[in-house]
From Swiss-Prot:
Belongs to the TVP38/TMEM64 family. It comes from the Eukaryota. It comes from Emericella nidulans (strain FGSC A4 / ATCC 38163 / CBS 112.46 / NRRL 194 / M139). Golgi membrane protein involved in vesicular trafficking and spindle migration. This is Golgi apparatus membrane protein tvp38. InterPro entries: Golgi_membrane_TVP38/TMEM64, VTT_dom. The keyword ATP-binding does not apply. Residues 103-119, 171-234, 295-410 are cytoplasmic. The gene is tvp38. The lineage of its organism: Eukaryota, Fungi, Dikarya, Ascomycota, Pezizomycotina. Residues 1-36, 373-410 are annotated as: Disordered. The chain crosses the membrane at residues 82-102, 120-140, 150-170, 235-255, 274-294. Residues 149-258 are annotated as: VTT domain. Residues 378-395 have a biased composition (Basic and acidic residues). Keywords: Golgi apparatus, Membrane, Transmembrane, Transmembrane helix. GO terms for cellular component: Golgi membrane.
Length: 410
């Protein structure tokens, strides 16, 4: 009876969670990798579960942002706080200064806009201006679009703006890729996030490029950044820029409305002024909302394609490991293969495959002086007293070294 009681107590003390049946994925995983991999898997699962839902209210997002900002502010040292305040003040001063200078530019252009509207040299100068600000780190691309609409009207200004933007983006792309080629190779080999984003563009590259071009990103910096993706070709990038060129009607339209208000503001009725001002505000709001929406969709699509690419690489790694064969190349393109290999190393750590060589034994023979010593010491069947005794003198210094290198999976 006491024995039965003790066994019953031990059975009841066992946690019910420990008796669950392992999933198929856990049973197929190597025993040496379960401990570390389970920790990473659980951490990744918890991180995915803790991701905030995008349908949260605006006030909740604002409160969360305020809390993060306050927490970051409290962690700063005194000089870091001083530097942050100075940086914010500098940005505000630059922003207001840019608005003031832009206003002065339009005031200066007002009297000459009608004369320059049909001038070919002015058209060429404006076109070259838009073309050259395509190269990083130059700025002023949006201002050139508004000025083009101000001087030449909506359609002529858009034609100037769009054509110079497309050709400028292609040339900037080629120049940036030439200059940054070594930087590209280092990023592909070391940064798994960059490698993942580069590989996602091979699925629906044109569609994703169009979405990126619609995002509210700095124009010249975006040209240089996208040129670092090895899977993007210059003509494809130029085609994506041409496809989204209707977006460039917005700054040209705003510039034309500003000219109308500047020239005929005194003659307009209050209703006409309000309509023109309202159209400008709606155009700006539509551009901001569209850019924000496309930016969110672009991030979601890139993450979806990255998961697909990782899944394909994971299946390839598992198949190679199950067949006891070395890892094969993922692509004939060396840069694409380097990016895929970077992701493969990350997937190896997640799965638990630290080495794909299954107990291969390499025999290394250090025989640099082997042939010379053979010629000096021919083989003899008889041993005389004149020769050294190997058991007394030892092996000496010039001996053959046999080293066994065994690759062991941890």
């Amino acid at each position: 009876m006491p024995a039965d009681y003790a066994s019953t107590a031990r059975a009841l003390s066992v946690s019910t969670t420990s008796s669950r049946s392992p999933s198929p994925g856990e049973g197929a995983r190597p025993l040496w990798s379960q401990g570390a991999t389970d920790t990473r898997t659980n951490a990744g699962f918890a991180a995915r579960r803790s991701t905030p839902i995008p349908k949260q209210g605006i006030m909740a997002r604002i409160n969360a942002f305020n809390e993060r900002s306050l927490a970051l502010w409290r962690k700063m040292t005194f000089w870091q706080k001083v530097g942050s305040v100075l940086a914010v003040l500098s940005l505000n001063i630059l922003g207001f200064g840019f608005l003031y200078i832009t206003g002065r530019v339009f005031q200066w252009l007002g009297p000459v806009a009608e004369k320059w509207e049909h001038s070919v040299p002015v058209f060429i100068v404006m076109w070259l201006g838009v073309f050259f600000v395509s190269f990083p780190p130059l700025v002023g691309w949006s201002t050139f679009g508004t000025v083009s609409g101000f001087i030449f009207g909506v359609w002529k200004g858009w034609l100037l703006y769009a054509s110079a933007t497309v050709l400028g983006s292609i040339c900037s792309f080629i120049a940036s890729r030439t200059v940054l080629s070594k930087f590209v190779h280092r990023l592909v080999e070391r940064d798994k996030r960059f490698a993942a984003l580069a590989l996602t563009l091979k699925y629906d590259g044109l569609k994703l490029l169009c979405m990126i071009r619609l995002c509210p990103l700095p124009y010249s910096i975006c040209n240089g950044a996208i040129s670092t993706f090895p899977t993007v070709q210059p003509l494809m990038y130029g085609l994506a820029t041409a496809i989204i060129s209707p977006k460039l009607l917005v700054p040209a339209f705003i510039g034309s409305r500003i000219r109308i208000l500047n020239e005929k503001g005194e003659e307009m009725s209050l209703g006409s002024k309000l309509i023109n001002i309202f159209s400008i505000i709606v155009s700006i709001a539509a551009g901001i909302f569209t850019g924000w929406y496309i930016y969110r969709r672009t991030l979601a699509r890139a993450q979806e394609l990255e998961e697909r690419e990782r899944e394909d690489i994971r299946h390839s790694l598992e198949a190679d490991h199950a067949a006891h064969r070395p890892q094969r190349a993922f692509s004939d393109d060396p840069i694409v293969n380097a990016a895929a290999t970077t992701l493969a190393r990350d997937e190896e750590e997640r799965i638990g495959f630290n080495d794909f060589d299954d107990d291969n034994v390499d025999l290394v023979i250090d025989d640099d002086d082997l042939s010379s010593r053979r010629s000096k010491s021919p083989y003899k069947d008889e041993f005389t007293d004149n020769e050294s005794d190997v058991f007394r003198d030892g092996d000496g210094t010039n001996t053959d070294t046999y080293t066994l290198h065994t690759h062991v999976r941890h």
